[in-house]
Amino acid sequence: GLWEKIREKANELVSGIVEGVK
């Protein structure tokens, strides 16, 4: 559903931020 897609995108953003901090 819609929430799954939103959460998936949010996880990608968080992962990108974490990678940027490393």
From Swiss-Prot:
Tissue: Expressed by the skin parotoid and/or rostral glands.
Keyword Zinc: no
Cleaved signal peptide residues: none
Annotated GO CC locations: extracellular region
The organism's place on the tree of life at top rank: Eukaryota
Task performed by this protein: Antibacterial peptide, that adopts an alpha helical conformation which can disrupt bacterial membranes. Each caerin displays a different antimicrobial specificity.
Cellular localisation: Secreted
Protein name per the record: Caerin-3.4
